């Protein structure tokens, strides 16, 4: 369904098309592994009536340890603010890495609404629950110190990931996410990924929704779980 006239930036080319809604998560602005330029390219090429920022957009954990904020990260923030000013409805749903923003639920900043969760109605009338998903992660819920330890290891894999993909680019190979691969393998061994997906889908169904859009586990997915549409943004 075409987006309204005010839902795009004049400077953007929209070669990728316009959509009713776009969902992005786990950008981790403030880390060296953030793919800010790729995100800027995506946003310039795609516009939408609704833009859902489904958590971990800013990595507050890493910024507290070491400040890292290049111009490209600032450009992403400016792009999101400009998108809101141009008429796109932008909703920010904080995750565990940007949980500091949960202290501002119900407020708007530059036209961006901060909410704990949201419900998006699709063109065919289905109700999709939008939540980051960290509330369902046993690692976060049961042992937050373990999550912080895991975050240190995750930052290391991001650095390693950059070096590996530099080599892959020289070899003409496409981008590959080592961090997502390792997180998938480690958590799969502990049955976290499967348990997470099922738990989120069950919660969505229990609340009367037809599906759920989440992030958090850095594993892009779209599948049916016992009659409920489960969608994960990946990273």
Place the predicted regions along the sequence by residue.
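Short histidine/acidic/glycine/proline-rich micro-motifs that form metal-
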Residues: 27-30, 136
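Active-site glycine-centered loops adjacent to acidic/histidine catalytic or metal-binding residues
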Residues: 26, 55-56, 95, 132, ...
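Residue-level marker for buried hydrophobic side chains located in beta-strands
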Residues: 21-23, 51-53, 129, 213
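Intrinsically disordered, low-complexity, charge-rich segments with an acidic bias
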Residues: 4-13
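Conserved beta-sheet core of the metallophosphoesterase superfamily
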Residues: 110-116, 129, 134, 138-148, ...
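N-terminal short leaders/motifs
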Residues: 60-84, 167-172, 178-212
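Core catalytic region of metal-dependent phosphoesterases/phosphodiesterases
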Residues: 1, 15-20, 29-124
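Active-site-proximal loop/helix segment associated with metal-binding centers of metalloenzymes
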Residues: 131-196
